[in-house]
């Protein structure tokens, strides 16, 4: 199971939010490329980046910072946040990003996502509140059940689904294993759990579930609750 550290970017700084609320942004580094190098030195192979400004603006607001992160490390990088066009996908991939996370557009335009998944490395981000998909920086909650959206992508050729329980995000109160497992079951493809990881025991619980391919960790590391070096050595 892949452990994937996360960097959320707001005005080129590494921040963490609570339940996706931009007003709760806490800055952890004004040099996120150094933070990325730190993750690499601890043993990470992947890095999860969200352009928070981009998620609301629908543009690559933090592209230059992401380019610097990519050039500073040998990490495989996945990026999400306001990516809605082929041109934007190409610009990220041309910058050295490994794969693209498509969130809001995965609900609004599934055919577009299925089309680009034929030619590019795509991950679908499904963010949910009480089981229903939230989009546009989590500002709007739809009537689509997360598990039903996951089913749409069962045979679409996407690499994975990132399943985020927004109610747990940044709360350090434990990952929602059942939610992630339900997405994995509905889609039949690799599912990465996100939101609420508080310590290494959460990672162990996900591993025991058996069908979770990865986990994204953020605030637990930043707040000193999770020893990433130990986690990587544990060979989950």
Swiss-Prot record:
Main location: cytoplasm
GO biological process, one term: L-tryptophan biosynthetic process
Assigned EC number: 5.3.1.16
Record's subcellular location: Cytoplasm
Catalytic residues identified in the record: 8, 127
Pathway given in the UniProt record: Amino-acid biosynthesis; L-histidine biosynthesis; L-histidine from 5-phospho-alpha-D-ribose 1-diphosphate: step 4/9
Family named by the database record: Belongs to the HisA/HisF family.
Identification of the protein by name: 1-(5-phosphoribosyl)-5-[(5-phosphoribosylamino)methylideneamino] imidazole-4-carboxamide isomerase
Organism: Campylobacter fetus subsp. fetus (strain 82-40)
Lineage: Bacteria, Pseudomonadati, Campylobacterota, Epsilonproteobacteria, Campylobacterales
Gene it is expressed from: hisA
